[in-house]
Amino acid sequence: MRVLHVCSELYPLLKTGGLADVLGALPFAQKEIGIDTRILLPAYPKISAGIENTHVVTEFDNFAGHVVLRYGEYNGVGIYLIDAPHLYWREGNPYHDTDYNDYADNYKRFALLGWVGAELATGLDSWWRAEVVHAHDWHAGLAAAYLFNKGRPAKSVFTIHNLAYQGQFAHHHLHEIGLPEGMFHVNGLELFGQISYLKAGLYYSDMVTAVSPTYAKEITTPDFAYGLQGLLTGLREAGKLVGILNGVDQEIWHPSCDAYIQHHYKLKSIAGKKKNKADLQAYFNLPQQPDALLFVMVTRLTEQKGLDLLIATADEIVKQGGQLAILGSGAKHLEEGICQLAQRYPENIAVKIGYDEALSHLMVAGGDVILVPSRFEPCGLTQLYGLQYGTLPLVRATGGLADTVTNSTSETIEASTATGFVFQKAEADDLRSAIQHAFALWQKQRVWARIRNNAMAQDFSWKNAAAQYEQLYLGILNQ
């Protein structure tokens, strides 16, 4: 089975969000179970620097100008690079300039990505032809539309990592990207009078996946559908929209071999966790108190991530003698809000604005509770890291958070299924109650240890997702 992943990011070479983590793991897990998997990416500077010794597959001119298609390998997986410097040779973020303005030619940059994805199913590389084109998020959404326009020479899958980003462009660009006017209608590319690259992926693909079962349900409701409720509901009712949970790359995120932490540990040998906690407290200049319940949060500082809820309830952590360490950057008013808390409670709350990969690993390893109070969360990875490291996730019941964390009630503790703390409403009072619940169980260290053991015993390795995608591919290939 030959599968081509079409995407715009790849961890660790280029990352702006969780999309990169998925593409840095899923294709490699699929290769391990025997799928002939390749990845198609724009040749951004960071991508090109990380994939050396490429050779030219072909050169061509199309609506996007002169393009060279290159091929190389990265960690054993074949990589196609679209070498078009006039479109992709821009340092930094792949989607916008340093002032956060989207690039004016994004419509063309990502149309080309989809176009090449479709052409690799029809002989652009005479040595390899994709049977399944698997496109990720709006950047790759047009791949399915180009396949449709060519008579569907291969099967197509589209994965929604975040429906909030839709890739909408003015109608007048249609003639510039090689698609016929007849595809611009409500049963096609059109959304609110514009071309929607995301809708193209939804409408023209043989199968659509979301990154968790709960998110696949949520996006059929008005609060989460962003104007696509009718289409998404229809897909779900037709059995063409399913949820497949993301996994954890255990070569990077596992407490027994994490390259970023000093003290390794595992389920049956937990002593290293306490040492990591001491290291983390020292890093943030928090009192070295092993008995203080240490909450950590590694996140973008946005309302979506529930930062405003935490700011409103952090006093509960202080009142109960706990500690809170936060790493992230984002909205200025939220950065200021948490920094003010740290100034007010220096013995209890510490903040680092920015992102630091090594520190994020230490926080997951050294914390007792990892906070993910998101308003919505398609899948979420931090709670999975928390489970893996025995840092109990405290999450809101949404998206992948609802699918992966089991609230610690007397029943679930008794049944050995409890793995963390879950609250229902995106309200400060609900979060406060969950924090109080965590403190109550922290007083019962034997119970806490049982919950931590349950959490660490969960299996969210990528081999599970790889096997589910294999079944999905086989299903559409046999249609």
Task: Report residues per predicted region.
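Catalytic cores of nucleotide-sugar-dependent glycosyltransferases that transfer UDP/GDP/TDP-activated
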Residues: 1-479
